[in-house]
Amino acid sequence: MMQEEGNRKGPWTEQEDILLVNFVHLFGDRRWDFIAKVSGLNRTGKSCRLRWVNYLHPGLKRGKMTPQEERLVLELHAKWGNRWSKIARKLPGRTDNEIKNYWRTHMRKKAQEKKRPVSPTSSFSNCSSSSVTTTTTNTQDTSCHSRKSSGEVSFYDTGGSRSTREMNQENEDVYSLDDIWREIDHSAVNIIKPVKDIYSEQSHCLSYPNLASPSWESSLDSIWNMDADKSKISSYFANDQFPFCFQHSRSPWSSG
């Protein structure tokens, strides 16, 4: 009883680990109470065994468990429960304490996942997808509104109900018959006008007599002038000039 109270507790030092390894090589890993007495470590047999099995054994594996080892731990625990030493025998290089620590960590993570129904990653992805969808919809609406305001027609437009502005524009484009005839007259004037301009330019070089207006008054004046000329001619021949001509030029068949 006094001997147990004099045993040392707490963390192992490097000198204690070296001393324990040497005595285990001498006497094997079975007689832990004897090793604890003869080594002078002032440790219990149980403490020496746990130190050897969990930390100093040369066949121990270091590092994280592989996925195959984790799956085997879950299967064996479902079969045997919390019998960690028995489970450790099926996993060479893994200690019962290491297997127990892995199991507790696994159950703690599983409980945290149940308390948190929606993970931040999934919620962030959902928010991102919804924001992208909203941005795409707003962009399409803005582009459609800009095409309507600018009057452009998109390749994807399939017709449909026309706006009031387009119908009013078509009504404004309808012409009446008077407008059509007015446009024709205006076109005719524009066509004839260049010809008139050509002759006006040539008139600077050539002078033409003024033509009489083909009215009825001018026609009557010309008729009266013709009558006056006839009267002059008749009076002219009434003189002795014509007989004088006959006196000088007698016919060959006249006698004398």
Swiss-Prot record:
InterPro entries: EOBI/EOBII-like_plant (IPR044676), Homeodomain-like_sf (IPR009057), Myb_dom (IPR017930), SANT/Myb (IPR001005). GO terms for biological process: regulation of DNA-templated transcription. Induction: By salicylic acid (SA). Residues 108-169 are annotated as: Disordered. Residues 32-56, 84-107 bind DNA. Residues 4-56, 57-111 form the HTH myb-type domain. A motif (Bipartite nuclear localization signal 1) lies at residues 61-64. The keyword Iron does not apply. Transcription factor. This is Transcription factor MYB48. The lineage of its organism: Eukaryota, Viridiplantae, Streptophyta, Embryophyta, Tracheophyta. The gene is MYB48.
